[in-house]
Amino acid sequence: MRWMLMAIVATVVSTPAGGGDTGSIVVTIDGLRNAKGSARVALFNREPGFPDEEPAAYRTFVAEIVGAQVLVRFEQLPSGTYAVAMYHDENGDAKFNKGLFGIPKEGYGVSNNIVHAVRAPKFSEAVIPVSDGVKEIAIRVHY
């Protein structure tokens, strides 16, 4: 009996408050200049790879572009911090094309709409806290 009580206490102590909490992020992307290609959206839960290394993302989504806006929903996310990065893959090659000195050739955007002239946004600048419920964000595409 005593060991059962200890096991229950250990479980309660080791489980974070709201341990099963999950949330969602709804991303509205606007400012797309045309409906060519797709919008490639990546959700990151840590700095490495952010914003342009899609394989390093926690989750990814490829959205068909119909009209001037794209809506993407990431669901059942454990509570924590995330950042969203996207690019308009106009030529459909599934690559974020860049030119000389790494200057983007395709439209892009990140959460919190961070844009720098000389460097890519940092994860810490684009971070979004997520807990239970729905977090709605808007990303404006920059060309």
Regions found by a protein language model. Name each.
Residues 66, 78-79:
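Surface-exposed loops/turns
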Residues 14-17:
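N-terminal signal peptide c-region/cleavage motif recognized by signal peptidases
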Residues 90-98:
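Acidic, glycine-anchored loop motifs typical of Ca2+
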Residues 80-86:
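A short tyrosine-centered beta-strand micro-motif
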